[in-house]
């Protein structure tokens, strides 16, 4: 009751955003002030849970051994994660990657407008090779590389792709202290390709997405982490019943989502 009557500033900001989101059509770009952040967004309804996860639930809280950790923000969206990391570690060396061309512009604008102009940003999808890929830009935080398409009929665009393995191997800092990975279903393929360089990573926080009910990637990803010396914890299971699956499938359990995501945190013990 006390927290309802006297919410933290972060909760009060989230409630205000939620109230506005109810009155705004989906996928309507705009801007909003939350705490001392001036934020552009592509879809306010998807910004709200991001804010709650990061600034209220502490989904990206991380204890670094250095005051200036090296962080890769893979799937930066409009920049909330990078802004959080920059507030937590003002001297952090952060690179944020975002594939959606329209959202990337918002990411860059939000970094520049909120005291994080030294965060490097790159417009690219993280993948298993350098080049170009087709990307389903659905207008919020669920865009995905076309080979991982789950049947959402949205605008498809051609975007540059970068091989994450090469970025890790050639990083001028030598080690990646934290890899934040939110690449909407490409986790298995990308991490498998990165296996030869995983010893250069200290910790990982990722959203692991299951879009194909016939081919689950979680067992392979978790086994890969164990094989490469990581301890992991899994939580924040989120059903995604609104998504059509990559492959058709039915389950004998009515009302249970075939598609879901979960958060995996991995570290070296």
Roles of regions detected by a PLM:
Residues 1-269:
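Phosphate/nucleotide-binding beta-alpha loop and adjacent structural elements of enzyme active sites
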């Amino acid at each position: 009751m006390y927290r309802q009557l006297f919410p933290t500033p972060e909760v009060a900001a989230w409630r205000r955003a939620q109230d506005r989101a109810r009155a705004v059509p989906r996928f309507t770009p705009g801007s909003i002030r939350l705490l001392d952040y001036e934020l552009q967004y592509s879809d306010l309804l998807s910004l709200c849970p991001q804010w709650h996860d990061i600034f209220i639930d502490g989904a990206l809280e991380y204890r670094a051994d250095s005051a200036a950790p090296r962080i890769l923000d893979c799937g930066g969206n409009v920049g909330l994660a990078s802004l959080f990391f920059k507030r937590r570690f003002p001297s952090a060396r952060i690179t944020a990657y975002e594939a959606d061309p329209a959202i990337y512009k918002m990411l860059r604008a939000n970094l520049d407008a909120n005291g994080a102009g030294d965060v490097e940003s790159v417009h690219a999808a993280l993948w298993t090779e350098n080049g170009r890929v087709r990307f389903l830009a659905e207008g919020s935080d669920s865009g995905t590389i076309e080979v991982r398409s789950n049947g959402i009929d949205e605008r498809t665009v051609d975007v540059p792709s970068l091989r994450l393995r090469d970025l890790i191997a050639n990083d001028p800092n030598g080690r990646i202290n934290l890899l934040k990975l939110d690449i909407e279903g490409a986790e298995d393929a990308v991490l498998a390709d990165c296996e030869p360089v995983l010893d250069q990573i200290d910790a990982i926080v990722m959203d692991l997405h299951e879009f194909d009910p016939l081919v689950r990637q979680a067992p392979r990803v978790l086994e890969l982490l164990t094989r490469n010396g990581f301890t992991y914890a899994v939580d924040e299971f989120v059903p995604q019943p609104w998504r059509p699956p990559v492959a058709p499938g039915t389950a004998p359990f009515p009302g249970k989502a075939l598609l879901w995501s979960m958060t995996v945190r991995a570290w070296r013990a």
